[in-house]
Amino acid sequence: HDANGLGRRVVIEDDVVIKGKVISSDAEGNVYKSLYIYDGEQAIELRLMNDNYVNYPLGQIVYVKAQGLSLASYMLSLGAAPALEPDGTFPNDTPSEHDFSASGNSNIPTTEMVQQYVYRGELDTITEADVTVVDKDNYKTVLNDDLLGCLIRFEGLRSSYTTVDSNTYPNYLENVNGVYTNKYYQDEGLPITWAYNYDNTKYYGSSLFTYETTPTSLESGSYVVRVSGYARFALKELPADNAMVNITAIYTKYSSRTGGFITYQLLVSSYKDIEEL
């Protein structure tokens, strides 16, 4: 059962239990239907439902019965396993929220089902041991893909209003209706906020933070912070161009299905995890 490679998956057949500490929170609306847990060495995403912070707050120890769940390698995750087609293949016509072809699994669809797989242990706290700290001097040696899904404190990042790989930052993306629409604050005189609400439509905001003097790619040293238009801090003012910040976030990676267009993204649970210097 090789789960390596983009979009690979395997349904767990053995009676396996995973223990971890919750390191993400959806309380402020930026983390969506996901729970990240950390076992002291590596992290994994659990694809669940809304309002996970109620039963699984930050620091909560959880035990996950993995048998019957699907382990996917695109951003290591556990979620619901799709029913196989008669020929043994995975379905490709599932709704977007349950798009197994893209990620290898889907969100466990009900709270009752979640409780069958995810059990609470003791309530702990997030400690220094749970957070990897990087800065401009060590990020090249400390950061690697083994830390994807982990909680990272990026110290001394610089906000950069610039264009990298043909994308201009900050920008605002709407894809709720299946049509991708980018808006740039320069073109439309938009307020410079983490995300945006435009004509009653909520847009994801993408802003760039970097350790590089002149960022030329998003594969090393430059990171995109994506904020949902539904996040409580969506309309908070974005740090000014060249402002210095510390950001504590889940370290994630986006790639096209072919494995190209790699972008490292930072998933922020709370506005307090962004500190302007």
List PLM regions with ranges.
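OB-fold nucleic-acid-binding modules
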Residues: 1-32, 36-61, 65-277
